[in-house]
Amino acid sequence: MISLLKAREKLLSPLVSSTIRRLSSSLSYSREDSRDSEVLIHPSAVVHPNAVIGKGVSVGPYCTIGSSVKLGNGCKLYPSSHVFGNTELGESCVLMTGAVVGDELPGYTFIGCNNIIGHHAVVGVKCQDLKYKHGDECFLCIGNNNEIREFCSIHRSSKPSDKTVIGDNNLIMGSCHIAHDCKIGDRNIFANNTLLAGHVVVEDNTHTAGASVVHQFCHIGSFAFIGGGSVVSQDVPKYMMVAGERAELRGLNLEGLRRNGFTMSEMKSLRAAYRKIFMSTETVSLSFEERLTELEQDQELYSVPAVSAMLQSIRDSFTESRRGICKFRQWLDSTT
């Protein structure tokens, strides 16, 4: 009998050990899940009881969270950051010290997931347009994975029928300003002190150097580059580079195109098209419209998607309500 009991104990021992390990592991995961979902609010923070706080949110000292605020799972508010008004932050957003998001205004501020709002940045507040009517709804929508650095200011729209919109994966460096009703695409880099006036449209993959200024209603095409200290008062077509106190076209943004995966063949075609439009060597001088038409009739070049996109970007700039394109340096004494 004793030998039988010993044999049974020997047989069951691995099963018991395995069960204990599974239970221990389960309890460990349970404790980790509990820690991950725990909401940490510093005693000095002011959080309205009607605010919706997700799992794992951390609210630091002296923060303020208003009554209509929604914070997604995993958001972190560093000391003295504040969220006001009808404002929603997606998962894993970070507000650095002194950041202010939202305003007690009709409308809303919506910010997606994984965004960083830098020290003392002000995002989603009333615009500085005097045409804004008190009591009107105004809106700001920001996508995912944006880094908005210290002292930036981003304003809501100036009217209920419009929105200020920022896409995904943008880097907005320190002290930049994005005014009311701007439309910003994806993967743009705005260097320090870039200033965008109201209603500016910036497409995708653009790069502005420091202290660039863009006039209201201008349109910046994809893969464009704006040189440091430039004042842009007209549109910048796709793929082009501008610079100057009154920004002028300085050629194609070839380095930016190369970094973004454009082939040598595509860049060669773009250079040929650019020369036809802006650096024509024809003995008989053609008007700007005639040069565009001539390029459209060049089947070899126009069949390249990048070339046709560049040409369409130029043509769009001359439609009603648009400002035309920045002048080419050799145009300064010309009516074209």
UniProtKB/Swiss-Prot annotation:
GO molecular function: acyl-[acyl-carrier-protein]-UDP-N-acetylglucosamine O-acyltransferase activity
Enzyme category, top tier: transferase
Keywords from the UniProt entry: Acyltransferase, Lipid A biosynthesis, Lipid biosynthesis, Lipid metabolism, Mitochondrion, Transferase, Transit peptide
Residue numbers binding substrate: 128-131, 180, 199, 216
One GO BP: lipid A biosynthetic process
Stretch forming the transit peptide: 1-32
Protein location: Mitochondrion
InterPro entries referenced in this protein's UniProt entry, alphabetically: Acetyltransf_C, Acetyltransf_C_sf, Hexapep, Lipid_A_LpxA, Trimer_LpxA-like_sf
Signal sequence segment: none
Location, primary (coarse class): mitochondrion
Pathway: Glycolipid biosynthesis; lipid IV(A) biosynthesis; lipid IV(A) from (3R)-3-hydroxytetradecanoyl-[acyl-carrier-protein] and UDP-N-acetyl-alpha-D-glucosamine: step 1/6
Domain of life: Eukaryota
Disruption outcome: No visible phenotype under normal growth conditions, but plants lacking LPXA accumulate very low levels of 2,3-diacylglucosamine-1-phosphate.
EC number: 2.3.1.129
GO CC annotation, single: mitochondrion
Subunit structure: Homotrimer.
Known role: Involved in the biosynthesis of lipid A, a phosphorylated glycolipid that in bacteria anchors the lipopolysaccharide to the outer membrane of the cell. Lipid A-like molecules in plants may serve as structural components of the outer membranes of mitochondria and/or chloroplasts, or may be involved in signal transduction or plant defense responses (Potential).
Family: Belongs to the transferase hexapeptide repeat family. LpxA subfamily.
UniProt name for this protein: Probable acyl-[acyl-carrier-protein]--UDP-N-acetylglucosamine O-acyltransferase, mitochondrial
Naturally occurring in which organism (per UniProt): Arabidopsis thaliana (Mouse-ear cress)
